[in-house]
């Protein structure tokens, strides 16, 4: 049975796959993207192009005002983006305080307003060590709170919560997805740097699946 759902869609390969997984399940999808002052704002342009191509309703919400309250992340502040392998210590600087709770809260409110039954987002096991708001216990509790906080219960789904980026890409390949339509790099340049932790994890996923990454690198 088709349901209306909201997908938090950044434009990266994880949320791109989540978007198409929700569509493949037969859902009516509403895509929701956020500008929170991230350096890699190029991902929002990529997300818009994909939604336009597929006729998916797409809202981009500017929440950059929250940066007057939040600090300390290399994704939004004047702090160097870490290079090298996707390791816990080096990547902790990319944590935006309370980001997913903020984004999920807004997405849940949007879902209630649109009479949607669920919110999907792209948490996966590769993020568990680095991002507390991608861990199973967080997702479970957000699902509970979301169903309590409104008269209309909205479920929180993270379809790839228990698998890594390699498996996400494998599922996308099965669906025939074109990953040239995604952006992963944390640096906001014309081409992906290939050096930041996000690029490294992406490249490892393509190597593990035995295919070449279709995007251009510096």
Swiss-Prot record:
Upper taxonomic lineage: Bacteria, Pseudomonadati, Pseudomonadota, Gammaproteobacteria, Alteromonadales
Family to which this protein belongs: Belongs to the QueC family.
Residues annotated as binding ATP: 9-19
Translocase among keywords: no
Cofactor needs: Zn(2+)
GO biological process: queuosine biosynthetic process
Single GO MF annotation: ligase activity, forming carbon-nitrogen bonds
Keywords, in A-Z order: ATP-binding, Ligase, Metal-binding, Nucleotide-binding, Queuosine biosynthesis, Zinc
SUPFAM superfamilies (UniProt xref): Adenine nucleotide alpha hydrolases-like (SSF52402)
Cofactor note: Binds 1 zinc ion per subunit.
Name of the top EC class for this enzyme: ligase
Protein name: 7-cyano-7-deazaguanine synthase
Pathway involvement of the protein, from the record: Purine metabolism; 7-cyano-7-deazaguanine biosynthesis
Organism, scientific name: Idiomarina loihiensis (strain ATCC BAA-735 / DSM 15497 / L2-TR)
């Amino acid at each position: 049975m088709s349901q209306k759902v909201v997908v938090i869609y950044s434009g990266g390969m994880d949320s791109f796959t989540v978007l198409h997984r929700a569509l493949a399940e037969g859902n009516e999808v509403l895509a929701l993207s956020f500008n929170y002052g991230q350096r890699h704002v190029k991902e929002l342009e990529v997300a818009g192009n994909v939604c336009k191509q597929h006729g998916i309703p797409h809202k981009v919400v500017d929440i950059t005002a929250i940066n007057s309250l939040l600090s300390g992340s290399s994704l939004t502040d004047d702090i160097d983006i870490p290079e090298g392998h996707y390791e816990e210590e080096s990547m902790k600087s990319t944590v935006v305080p309370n980001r997913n709770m903020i984004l999920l809260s807004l997405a849940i409110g949007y879902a209630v307003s649109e009479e949607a039954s669920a919110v999907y987002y792209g948490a996966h096991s590769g993020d568990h060590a680095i991002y507390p708001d991608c861990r199973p216990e967080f997702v479970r509790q957000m699902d509970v709170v979301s169903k309590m906080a409104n008269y209309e219960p909205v479920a929180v789904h993270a379809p790839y919560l228990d698998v890594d980026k390699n498996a996400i890409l494998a599922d996308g390949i099965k669906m025939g997805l074109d990953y040239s339509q995604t952006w992963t790099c944390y640096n906001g340049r014309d081409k992906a740097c290939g050096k930041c932790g996000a690029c490294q994890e992406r490249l490892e996923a393509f190597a593990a699946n035995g295919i070449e990454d279709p995007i251009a690198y510096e």
